[in-house]
């Protein structure tokens, strides 16, 4: 018997390309449903399952996303069986409430990550300059040692 479930995914799952990944996994497993960002910061999936093993594989595949993508952080997946069956078109489809608003949020998130990358690059630049200074000092000392050895020979 086909049952409709709601899966609620908590964590850093919005504006990081998560729903696209869900669509891909769902289609690969032959699951029908929808995925959308909820205003509380979660991602929600409404999907039909007629096989418990497929549902568990779907959830495990979702959880595994955070290992492949450092932007995604899944805290927990909550599962609710719905009392009503909802018929969905084949595959998992993404629902967007406002594509422009969504795009702006993703751009804002992207800017945060770019700033983080630049700040880390500055730190790495300082470290590399320190290493360079140390190497220059080491070369000077080695040259002095070389000169002393040449004088003794």
Curated annotation (Swiss-Prot):
Q: Which GO terms describe its molecular function?
A: acylphosphatase activity
Q: Name one Pfam family in it.
A: Acylphosphatase
**Which InterPro entries has this protein been placed in?**
Acylphosphatase, Acylphosphatase-like_dom, Acylphosphatase-like_dom_sf, Acylphosphatase_CS
UniProt xrefs under Gene3D superfamilies: 3.30.70.100
Q: Where is the Acylphosphatase-like domain?
A: 4-102
Protein origin, superkingdom: Archaea
The protein's matches in PANTHER family, at most eight in alphabetical order, are given as: ACYLPHOSPHATASE (PTHR47268:SF4)
- Name-wise, this protein is Acylphosphatase-like protein MJ0553
Supply the source organism's classification: Archaea, Methanobacteriati, Methanobacteriota, Methanomada group, Methanococci
């Amino acid at each position: 018997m086909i049952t409709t479930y709601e899966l609620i995914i908590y964590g850093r799952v919005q504006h990081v390309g998560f729903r696209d990944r869900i669509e891909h996994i769902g289609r690969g497993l032959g699951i029908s449903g929808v995925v959308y960002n909820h205003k509380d910061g979660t991602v929600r999936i409404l999907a039909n399952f007629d096989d418990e093993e497929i549902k568990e594989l779907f959830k495990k595949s979702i959880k595994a996303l955070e290992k492949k993508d450092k932007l995604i952080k899944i805290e927990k997946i909550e599962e609710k069986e719905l009392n009503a069956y909802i018929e969905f078109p084949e595959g998992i489809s993404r629902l967007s409430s406002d594509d422009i608003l969504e795009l702006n949020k993703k751009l804002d998130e992207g800017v945060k990550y770019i700033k983080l990358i630049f700040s880390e690059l500055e730190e790495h630049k300082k470290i590399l300059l320190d290493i360079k200074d140390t190497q220059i000092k080491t070369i000077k000392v080695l040259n002095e040692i070389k000169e002393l050895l040449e004088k003794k020979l």
